[in-house]
Amino acid sequence: MDQVHHRALDALQSFIALTDSSSATSPRYIASIITNATSSPHTYVFAELLERPAVQALRSPDTPAEFQSYLTLLEIFAWGTWQDYQQTPNLPPLSEEQARKLRLLTLLSLASTIKPLTYEALMTSLSLSAPSELESLVTTAIYSSLITGRLSPATNPPTVNVTSVAPLRDVKPSSLPTMISTLTAWEARCGSVISDIETEIAKIRADSAQRRQKEHARAVAIEKTLEKWNAEGGEQLQGGNPGQGQGQGQGGLGKNAGWKPRDLSTAMFERGFFGGGSNKREFDDDGYFDGGSSDFDQHGSGMDIDEGAGARASGARHSKRFLGKKS
């Protein structure tokens, strides 16, 4: 599409050079340049030609009325439509080439403003009497790279599906304030969206930092709890039977010697983390003492039965019944 725009600008340069020549002093001569420029098959933009002093001189009150209308005609080719030409009186008649050019330019404008582009709407806007005329015009626009699209005559209603339009229409000066207002409103909406996104990002980061802080505190608490359990287990084993634990050192077990804590859930159960006020029946089938000692119980498996609800609360010690093989 950009190549089409460049080609259109290049095609206009020869007509601009003619308006800048020393011979471009006659209104009739300028009107002839406008006619040739709007009839050329490769010219689609005309704003640069409109800005030339010789062309703007046609607006002078001293210019004959028959030539003043050529300036209006050039403005319609720059940013107007076929309907604008039909509704403006006293304009020069169009040649076949000019009529096809103006219809093509009008198709570009309609493709950017009307959705969907039905056959009926296009034929009315372009003053075409048959669908075949519209299809021929659209085909010319597609092969000239003015639009990208396809014809859909079998749909109900028949439509022209346009996906892209070449930037070949000039901007009308009076429409600039509206464009600026539209862009300003769009900028404000973008700023609001960006502000909302930044606020959400800050919230996510704060939540993430808070979660990390909680996880760190939880990890520290667990580590301290495990250290406390290790210390308590070692202290309990220091008062063990000197006759046991041969090879562990004379006079009993040293601190933490031979103490192998089981998994965390078992340790937490033993320490009363899951509630110690209920009846407890614990059975060690592996023959190890419940106190954490690694010495094997020579008198059988250790089963301690703490009978009676509230036995822990009363503080009364119940004797353990050791069940196993008699020696």
UniProtKB/Swiss-Prot annotation:
Pfam family, one: CSN7_HB_subdom
GO CC terms of this entry: COP9 signalosome; cytoplasm
InterPro entries the UniProt entry points to: COPS7/eIF3m, PCI_dom
BP GO terms, sorted: cleistothecium development
Subcellular location: Cytoplasm; Nucleus
Region (Disordered) residue spans: 233-260, 276-327
PCI domain ranges (all copies): 4-165
Coiled-coil ranges from the UniProt annotation: none
Origin: domain of life: Eukaryota
SMART domains noted in UniProt: PINT
Record field: compositional bias (Gly residues): 236-255
Its biological purpose: Component of the COP9 signalosome (CSN) complex that acts as an regulator of the ubiquitin (Ubl) conjugation pathway by mediating the deneddylation of the cullin subunit of SCF-type E3 ubiquitin-protein ligase complexes. The CSN complex seems to link protein degradation to sexual development. May be required for sporulation only at elevated temperatures.
Quaternary structure and interacting proteins, as annotated: Component of the COP9 signalosome (CSN) complex.
PANTHER family in the record: COP9 SIGNALOSOME COMPLEX SUBUNIT 7, COP9 SIGNALOSOME COMPLEX SUBUNIT 7/DENDRITIC CELL PROTEIN GA17
Family statement: Belongs to the CSN7/EIF3M family. CSN7 subfamily.
UniProt name for this protein: COP9 signalosome complex subunit 7
